[in-house]
Amino acid sequence: MSQWTHVIATFRAQGIDHPMFPQINWQNRMSKNVPHGSEGPLQIVVNVSRDFGRVDTVVTVWGDLRDYDDEAEIMTYFTSIIPTPQQGAFIGEGVVRIRIEECGDDPEREYHYKFVGDGQSGEWMSIKR
């Protein structure tokens, strides 16, 4: 019997659409070290909207990873793709939900992106389900 890990995630980033400010290449940023099961990696869709001098980006990630159960590696990936304001984007909201089949009493985890300290940076915080 196969081990399956199900992932659904989304986050929203805001930036300034002006040559003075750094612009993020989301496809390049997202494509490094993507968690990968025996039948393929997580799927990624990036939607970018430019209006009134702003860049609004919504990133959606999902997938069913076969023969994979490394929750820590998934969260390391999500931590690595979040930019800082100095890199060109401010993360408004984010959520990651991971469900590992046949994982005992606590197979499902949810993480929310929360701001810490100065409000310029944040981290993924586990929400007990």
Annotate each predicted stretch with a short phrase.
Residues 1-29:
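Short, extreme N-terminal segment that most often corresponds to the first beta-strand
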Residues 27-129:
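Charged interaction segments
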